[in-house]
Regions:
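N-terminal hydrophobic/helix-forming segments and targeting peptides
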Residues: 1-437
Length: 437
């Protein structure tokens, strides 16, 4: 099973260079499993026992499996994110240098490790709006060839280059497109050729750089995987596998994958939006349930906020908490933070531990050092719209936000097993703080 999951994950990531492509790949998985696509602008007809999904902005997706015995139901939700740190093309992106080079003007998206983007084959991918008569239609594009490079400055020209020189995204991080002057509109022309449309009919583009390097298994025992965008496509994929596998007729099982986590989630398609609430409420309404039943269901509901975690780095062990160290290939990570950057508390941790015990999956505990700010994720942000008990979990990895990250191969199977058990469980709240599982 381990080899199959790794192979499926690496294929998934290779086809998902942007959040738009991630959602397209998730849609493919759902379509093959018999899900019906819904549209937010249309009336929903929902039936017990059926499976549905809906997208927003082509970069966020929520899928739902409706049980058949919903007299006493709750929502079982997993939430991950579809985006990863990258560089986004600006409008009028072409820059001419010395009447020789054509560079591309970009800006940072998310908190990437800039140095890891040097000296790698890169290309462009994203979403393009194309005029077709009186319609504007969405097209996804992926330039599937080595198109760009951001070369390092030679050490002979900067003897302090290994001493932590700050990198300026406007100066140091611009990619080379060509060794000749291509002029304004070169990118639009290239994209038009890729899509087989006229340049004049391209009315908008959201284009990002992506790392072309393929995934590899490495280590003495092939125990690691190196790959772009493991944060958070590793969780997005493995939680989808569990979602598709599990059966439960007494719940409404929900899979959510949001965009824009890397830039704060505050968009119409981010975790801070009404997207999750809108879908849950409309599902409830279409099933003939009233507001009282909806509120009761939410009170018994549970969410797994799935986003990768920092494993102990062997070269920087002092960067990890003294008593809460996590390691690759040793189980799912439960993340906690006193300042509520993570949603985990005694209740949600206890519930998830019971689920993992049933699934025979090991767990680890992560906390930041008390003198390090650390990062945050989407769980507590989503709670501002629809509040339910939530635990923040993830898979341990190294080099988070690098252009090429590392994780353990065993942990993916652990996540699939735990998520499958979660979706198959029946979590019900008897009273505040008391649950049946």
């Amino acid at each position: 099973m381990e080899k199959i999951i790794v192979s499926e994950l690496t294929s998934f990531i290779a086809h998902a260079p942007t959040a738009f492509h991630t959602v397209a790949e998730l849609k493919n998985l759902l379509n093959r499993d018999g899900f019906e696509e819904l549209h937010e602008s249309e009336r929903w007809e929902i039936e017990p026992g059926k499976k549905y999904y809906v997208t927003r902005n082509n970069s966020s997706i929520i899928a739902v499996k409706v049980g058949t015995d919903l007299d006493d139901y709750s929502f079982h939700v997993t939430a991950s994110h579809s985006d990863s740190p990258s560089f986004k093309l600006k409008e009028n992106a072409e820059i001419e240098i010395a009447k020789r080079y054509t560079m591309l003007n970009t800006e940072g998206y998310g908190g990437m490790i800039c140095s890891t983007w040097f000296d790698r084959p890169l290309s462009l991918a994203g979403k393009v709006m194309v005029k077709n008569g009186n319609r504007l239609e969405t097209h996804l594009v992926k330039v599937d060839r080595d198109l760009l490079m951001i070369p390092s400055l030679a050490i002979h020209m900067d003897r302090k280059i290994n001493e932590g020189r700050p990198l300026n995204k406007q100066v140091d991080m611009l990619p080379i497109l060509s060794g000749s002057v291509k002029g304004p509109g070169a990118v639009k022309k290239l994209i038009a050729e890729e899509l087989g449309v006229s340049e004049e009919n391209i009315y908008g583009m959201d284009l990002f750089l992506y790392n072309r390097m393929e995934a590899v298994r490495w280590g003495h025992d092939d125990e690691f995987i190196g790959c772009p965008r493991l944060d958070d496509l590793q969780c997005a994929f493995t939680s989808m596998k569990g979602f598709l596998t599990a059966e439960n007729n007494r719940n409404i099982n929900v899979y959510a994958c949001f965009d824009n986590e890397e830039v704060g989630s505050g968009t119409k398609q981010g975790a801070a939006s009404t997207f999750l609430y809108d879908v849950l409420w409309r599902m409830n309404k279409a099933l003939g349930k009233d507001e009282e039943e909806f509120r009761r269901a939410v009170a018994s509901s549970f969410m797994l906020s799935c986003d990768n975690a920092h494993a102990v780095h062997p070269n920087y062990r002092q960067k990890s908490d003294e008593t809460n160290c996590v390691y690759m290939n040793e189980g799912i990570v439960i993340k906690s933070h006193a300042g509520q950057k993570y949603t985990s508390d005694a209740v949600s941790v206890a519930i998830f531990k019971m689920i993992c015990e049933k699934a025979e999956v090991p767990v680890q505990f992560f906390s930041n050092r008390s003198d390090e700010a650390g990062g945050s994720t989407l769980g507590n942000i989503a709670m501002s719209q629809v509040s339910m008990n939530t635990v923040d979990i993830g898979l341990p990895q190294l080099a988070m936000h690098s252009a090429y990250e590392t994780a353990g191969v065993k942990d993916m199977e652990y996540m699939v097993k735990a998520v499958t058990e979660f979706y198959a469980s029946n979590i019900r709240g008897d009273s505040d703080g008391n649950f049946r599982i």
